[in-house]
Amino acid sequence: MINYLKGKTTQILKTPSNRNILILEVNHIGYEIQIPSRLARNLSLEEDQIVQIFTHLQIREDQQILYGFSTDSERDLFRQLININGVGTQTAIALIDTLGIEALINAIVTNDVKTLSKTPGVGPKTAERIALELKSKLSQWEQAIALKTPVSVGVPSREILEEVEMTLLALGYTDEEIDQAISAISQDNLLLKNPHVEEWLKSAIAWLS
């Protein structure tokens, strides 16, 4: 079993089905790894940068798929999610992408079905099942995960959010799409340090594309 891979990011591709594929070169071998959008946005293609990706290997009859995450906690939460009936790998990644690990764990532990249902493809029944099956498990190791997860550095200002919302509405996006995009990019600690609305708008459009 591969726990993690450490190497150079050579390519980040987007498939026709909107999945993010990282090509990670390790000892002259290029590994194809599907990663969450939030991780793809934070990776650099600089030649001298070495990154560590925590992996999960899915073996099927016709193929083997590697999924990659920025921390082992994120990877472990992904594994917990895909063990739930009706939650596949893409839904698990969408949950992590839409909410971020801290908000996702909190929503599960507090049985916040409304927040869980913000994720594309997750209806109220699936959200209830996730909370029911994982609430007690996550409560036991929530503190340990929080210690290993980078702490958020703040929240975006109301002025930034309002301008981003107005611009996205003018571009034709729906309220639901805008809420999901803002929820997702607000988990980006690097972006939270940035006071320029242009960068927030660029990140939101990239997430929506």
Swiss-Prot record:
Give the keywords, sorted.
Cytoplasm, DNA damage, DNA recombination, DNA repair, DNA-binding
Q: Which GO terms describe its molecular function?
A: ATP binding; four-way junction DNA binding; four-way junction helicase activity
Q: Where is this region: Flexible linker?
A: 150-160
- Coarsely, its chief localization is cytoplasm
Chain residue ranges for the region called Domain I: 1-70
Which portions of the sequence form the region Domain II? 71-149
- List localization entries: Cytoplasm
Identify the domain of life.
Bacteria
Return the GO cellular component terms, semicolon-separated.
cytoplasm; Holliday junction helicase complex; Holliday junction resolvase complex
Q: Where are the transmembrane segments?
A: none
The alphabetized list of GO BP terms reads: DNA recombination; DNA repair
Instruction: List S-S links within the chain.
Output: none
Name the segments for region: Domain III: 160-209
Q: What is known of its domains?
A: Has three domains with a flexible linker between the domains II and III and assumes an 'L' shape. Domain III is highly mobile and contacts RuvB.
The UniProt family comment states: Belongs to the RuvA family.
**What's the stated role of this polypeptide?**
The RuvA-RuvB-RuvC complex processes Holliday junction (HJ) DNA during genetic recombination and DNA repair, while the RuvA-RuvB complex plays an important role in the rescue of blocked DNA replication forks via replication fork reversal (RFR). RuvA specifically binds to HJ cruciform DNA, conferring on it an open structure. The RuvB hexamer acts as an ATP-dependent pump, pulling dsDNA into and through the RuvAB complex. HJ branch migration allows RuvC to scan DNA until it finds its consensus sequence, where it cleaves and resolves the cruciform DNA.
Subunit structure, per the record? Homotetramer. Forms an RuvA(8)-RuvB(12)-Holliday junction (HJ) complex. HJ DNA is sandwiched between 2 RuvA tetramers; dsDNA enters through RuvA and exits via RuvB. An RuvB hexamer assembles on each DNA strand where it exits the tetramer. Each RuvB hexamer is contacted by two RuvA subunits (via domain III) on 2 adjacent RuvB subunits; this complex drives branch migration. In the full resolvosome a probable DNA-RuvA(4)-RuvB(12)-RuvC(2) complex forms which resolves the HJ.
Name of this chain's protein: Holliday junction branch migration complex subunit RuvA
